[in-house]
Amino acid sequence: MGSCCSCLDRDSVPHNHPTKFKVTNVDDEGVELGSGVMELTQSELVLHLHQQEAVRWPYLCLRRYGYDSNLFSFESGRRCQTGQGIFAFKCSRAEEIFNLLQDLMQCNSINVTEEPVIITRNSHPQELDLPRGSSQPTGYTVSSFSNGFPGCPGEGPRFSSAPRRPSTSSLRHPSPGEESTQTLIASDEQSHTYVNTPTGEEDRRSRHCLQPLPEGRVPFPPQTQVSDQRDPQVFLQPGQVKFVLGPTPARRQVMKCQSLCPSMQDPPLHNNNEGPSECPAQPKCTYENVSGGLQQGAGWRLSPEERGWSGLAHRRAALLHYENLPPLPPVWESQVQQLRGEAGDDGDSKDGLTPSSNGFPDGEEDETPLQKPTSTRASARSHSSFPVPLTRRRGSPRVFNFDFRRPGPEPPRQLNYIQVELKGWGTAHPKGPQNPSVSGAPGPTPHPARSSDSYAVIDLKKTVAMSNLQRALPRDDGTVRKTRHNSTDLPL
């Protein structure tokens, strides 16, 4: 909370002034820090202090604001004079400050949305939470959701959010040992629910079904009923809001296959390849690991009657496998499996850890398909979001191995040396290739005393003299600048 010092002549401000209000700044504990006069202008909130410069908060920099009985609070952004923070002021006219600020926001064409805050009753003192999202339209008496349906009347205090959304890290929560007396920060025991804003024409056409529930807690529908309800639903009651999410596009495809082939609706730990095929005429869905690409004879096996699946079979299969792949085991587990795989490198068995293109042993992907996904996102609250893989075949490790085997080093190449015989230089030497040892360095010659006869002798002094003579030649083209280095022409 911001700390503000004493006020500017509080007695001179009448109690019913339209734009000036007597306020007292409080901290997280509700302790009064100082008093002042809060003034609402056409563009900013001004706090007048005694013998100090006034503090200003432009309306465009306010993230959210609200009131509760005799407490007015707001959250400022990073561009304000005070920086980012939450400020609370006690005032008997807190509701008037809120309403006036709401009107000024709308007059300045600032997008203001009201957020419903639903608080469950508990034994602790009533506290309210600052909402973390702003996706509801403006309202004064009845909160409303983004899809146009009216919500339940707000039992708690009212909060409005400015266009900028703060991050969750910007909200200040009291320490575990604190018991805040001012109703601004909420505890972890309180539940708050919000409705996501749908975007796009498809979401607008498929609006949520809104079904009011009687008072009291209503348990979630069973998982079997959730699978039959294809559209997301929102259940409202005065105390809280219940959500039932619809299946994902990948889940819809699985449900379509299950509706076509009843044998697909097996227990969660049932293998697709082990069950009897009771409906051979219907298309069958097969799941496999496709992290390295689809192999021949695997993937989606559909009948020719499914014309819509012919062009997008690989793409939809990849989407299904991407969402339903189990998490990989830790890398350190591959060290134990690697020791077992090194023993079988000489044979043709596939129990080793020679990785394929996708990091798993070759020839085993079709034998251990993944578990069928049977849970939707509605049941993900109590279950894992990834299916559990089936029991792996004995002797066939499925651990991802990053130690890709590389071919051994190539044998060193042999270098052939030949000696050139110069005329008049010593005796004749035999011609022909000589193959030294494999070490790469030439071996010792049989005649070390005559090894210098095979090379030409360069006269370094003569070479330097010829170079100096060439540089000293005169240049009469007129383009060379005369310096002390080339001004003297040496005779040829």
Curated annotation (Swiss-Prot):
GO molecular function: fibroblast growth factor receptor binding; identical protein binding; transmembrane receptor protein tyrosine kinase adaptor activity
Keywords recorded for this protein, A-Z: Lipoprotein, Membrane, Myristate, Phosphoprotein
Lipid-bearing positions (N-myristoyl glycine): G2
Region of interest: Disordered: 125-205, 337-413, 425-492
Biased composition regions of type Low complexity, renumbered to the chain: 374-385
InterPro entries: Docking_Protein_DOK, FRS2_PTB, IRS_PTB, PH-like_dom_sf
An individual GO BP term: fibroblast growth factor receptor signaling pathway
Function: Adapter protein that links FGF and NGF receptors to downstream signaling pathways. Involved in the activation of MAP kinases. Down-regulates ERK2 signaling by interfering with the phosphorylation and nuclear translocation of ERK2.
Name of the protein in its database record: Fibroblast growth factor receptor substrate 3
Organism field: Rattus norvegicus
Organism ancestry: Eukaryota, Metazoa, Chordata, Craniata, Vertebrata
